[in-house]
């Protein structure tokens, strides 16, 4: 009896995951949508802390939360590129990185974005790095970039002052990480 219940429970989980995967696939379609939406695209780079250079990050994970609930998760391309549509009228938190990198978060307030037939486009390149044990990267627990609609320019705009402050803090941690990694190599 217990064995039958376990098999049934596993079967239900399998069926639910198949439907969930299908729904997520539909959400990230790159075909133009008939609903009001905006497009986010760019390149995800892997930043080498020691060498100070970047290269495209193949298959980096992207997780999107809509109004604080999981909306979709997928991987960028082999060349580091990503592109996806999101409906207007919501707040989003987009996590770039997954388990391979220290995650960077993007907060998007699309609640004031006007509804239109044409899609708006946001281009955002993201630089990720691997976490270094012993270095505090808690600065990344909060969004690194904030973006919202600016009616004067009729476009989505990055909060430059907020991002600049976050970058100063992150640069301090990256400098410590570089020093630690270089001293470990001797």
What is each of the regions a protein language model found here?
Residues 38-40, 49-67, 149-153:
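Short, ordered, surface-exposed loop/turn motifs in non-cytosolic proteins
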Residues 83-92, 99:
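Short Pro-Gly-centered beta-turn/loop motif in secreted/extracellular proteins
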Residues 8-17:
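Sec-dependent N-terminal signal peptides
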Residues 95-111:
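A short, solvent-exposed loop/turn motif at the edges and junctions
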Residues 1-8:
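Positively charged n-region of N-terminal signal peptides that target proteins for export
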Residues 67-81:
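Short, acidic Ser/Thr/Gly-rich low-complexity loop/linker segments typical of extracellular
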Residues 23-39, 45:
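Beta-strand-rich domain onsets/edges
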Residues 24-31, 111-154:
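Extracellular beta-sheet/turn segments enriched in Thr/Pro/Gly and aliphatic residues
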């Amino acid at each position: 009896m217990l064995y039958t219940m376990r098999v049934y429970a596993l079967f239900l989980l399998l069926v639910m995951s198949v439907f969930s995967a299908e729904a997520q696939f539909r959400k990230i379609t790159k075909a133009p949508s008939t609903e009001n939406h905006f497009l986010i695209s760019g390149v995800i780079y892997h930043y080498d802390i020691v060498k100070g250079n970047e290269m495209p990050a193949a298959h980096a994970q992207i997780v999107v939360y809509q109004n604080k609930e999981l909306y979709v998760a997928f991987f960028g391309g082999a060349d580091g590129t990503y592109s996806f549509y999101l409906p207007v009228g919501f707040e989003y938190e987009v996590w770039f990185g997954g388990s391979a990198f220290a995650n960077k978060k993007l907060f998007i307030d699309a609640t004031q974005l006007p509804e239109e037939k044409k899609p708006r486009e946001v281009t955002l390149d993201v630089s990720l790095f691997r976490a270094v044990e012993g270095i505090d990267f808690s600065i990344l627990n909060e969004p690194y970039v904030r973006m919202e609609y600016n009616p004067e320019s009729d476009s989505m705009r990055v909060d430059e002052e907020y991002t600049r402050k976050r970058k100063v803090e992150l640069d301090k941690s990256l400098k410590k990480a570089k020093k630690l990694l270089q001293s470990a190599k001797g």
